[in-house]
Amino acid sequence: MSKLYIICIILFYSLFIGVKAHAQYAGAKYEKGPSPKMEILQVDNRELSTMVYMAYTTPDADNWNETSSWMNFGDKTFIQVEGSSKQYHMISTINMPINSEAENKYMMFDRRNQRHQFILEFEKIPEGKSFDIIEDVNNPNAFNFYGITYTPTDSNSYVDVDEFIAGYPVKEMGRYVVKGN
């Protein structure tokens, strides 16, 4: 009986500590970014990674498709935390194509004012620090976000990934190089 009691106590504390070790923050803001139509909805610091929940809405102009008919994120995208030169690399994306030298992939938009929600997953960053998301520091058209902040007291519950992207299917187009051609 005492072994069962000890196991139950250990499990209880493990679960309690596990829940406290992760944090989710809604209402993240950034000082400078690529477009006011790009939103950072939530930052989740999970056990092994940091997930950034985002949304983009195409412009409501008649010529929306001249500037906003597609989007993607480069495979070298990373997070840099304030006061550090360490790069926390993007691990994967959910509902957003990753573009690389070997394979060009794009999310294609169908109409003006179209909203698309997606998630970028990075190596785990330290909690409570402001950070930047850098796609390409040398490209003025890249998705670079500077001064991303969130309030640690604005803790929120985890977002269900399937529900988050359910209404926003990705329409992907791609091409790749074979033998240099």
Question: Residues of each region from the PLM?
Answer:
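Bacterial Sec-dependent N-terminal signal peptides
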Residues: 1-26
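Pro/Ala/Gly-rich low-complexity, hydrophilic intrinsically disordered segments
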Residues: 147-181
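Low-complexity, acidic Ser/Thr/Pro/Gly-rich terminal tails and inter-domain linkers that flank the onset
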Residues: 24-48, 88-100
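The feature marks short-to-medium sequence segments in extracytoplasmic or secretory-pathway proteins
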Residues: 58-108
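Short, well-ordered beta-strand segments enriched in hydrophobic/aromatic residues
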Residues: 48-61
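Terminal connector regions
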Residues: 135-150
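Short, solvent-exposed, Trp/other aromatic-anchored flexible loops in extracytoplasmic proteins
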Residues: 86-131, 138-139
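Hydrophobic residues positioned within well-ordered beta-strands of beta-sheet architectures
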Residues: 52, 116-118, 146
